[in-house]
Amino acid sequence: KLKIPLIHTYHTMYEDYLHYIGKGKVIRQSHVKYLSRLFANHTTGVVCPSERVIDTLRSYGVIAPLRVIPTGIDIEKFKRSDITQQDISKLRESLGLQENHLMILSLSRISYEKNIQALINGFPQVISAYPNARLVIVGKGPYVEELEELISELQLEEFVQFTGEVDNNDVALYYKAADYFVSASTSETQGLTYTEAMAAGTPCVVEGNAYLNRLFDHPSLGKTFETDEDFAPALIDYISSEVPKDPKVLEAKLYDISSTHFGEAMIEFYQDMVVYHEEEMRRKEEEDSIERIKIKLNSFKR
């Protein structure tokens, strides 16, 4: 009614979460497809955090302009120069970790779609190569009991622990205390915890996609793998490679994932969509004008 541009952001792969609503029997994939297409095609443009989202929306039949703009983070919140080595040592000690232990960190909501089970299933292979490896799982969620049963089944109680939910102010400390951050989630549209870990200076070994493969495009930042079965070999290979950190590469990447860069990209998209909206309004007015002329001509012929 107001005839002004409307920008929407589409950040969630809703199909991955349907099982939470009536065990997936109330809302189906076809409903998500229809509603997403209906809404998105009534906007001027849609912001997507990754190519995966764009590909999904195109498959739904969305024809509105789409642009990849990953959500930026507050870099300083995770760089945290105030965190000392003493702070890190104190945390590791509270987790029962010795100096020679490799702290492998998983930090997320503990739910089925986060695929933490793949990390646990692969961990026996990891500790066969690195007996000093310890998996620390941070977070809470509905899938804890199932994972605890899996840990017991694989006899990994000595090597895997849950911390529960931690205070938001302590998240950066956990990243910094870890030797490696890991994830096998396939439900991520961009993976903010990955960029948070990167900002904290912790290398990541994560299940990849088009966006993440570009994010971790330098060995000093981390490594991606393709399937659940690839997790353990990928982590073992990365640990054994002892890739040195590259501050210049990290700083360049941190700008790309910063809230500052995100803001600049959003402003540019807004400006582009204002122009696009004006052009679309003119085009529709011209089409309406031509249609009115046709109607008048037809009335004269009669």
Residue ranges, per PLM feature:
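Conserved donor-binding/catalytic core segment of Leloir-type glycosyltransferases
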Residues: 98-114, 120-123
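Conserved acidic donor-binding segment of nucleotide-sugar-dependent glycosyltransferases
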Residues: 218-229, 236-243
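Carbohydrate-associated surface elements
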Residues: 52, 72
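Nucleotide-activated donor-binding/catalytic signature segment of Leloir-type glycosyltransferases, i.e.
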Residues: 145-166
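Aromatic "clamp/platform" in nucleotide-sugar-dependent glycosyltransferases that forms part
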Residues: 186
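A charged, aromatic-enriched C-terminal amphipathic alpha-helix characteristic of glycosyltransferases
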Residues: 243-295
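Short hydrophobic beta-strand element within catalytic cores of glycosyltransferases
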Residues: 203-206
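Short alpha-helical donor nucleotide-sugar binding micro-motif in glycosyltransferases
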Residues: 165-166, 173-178
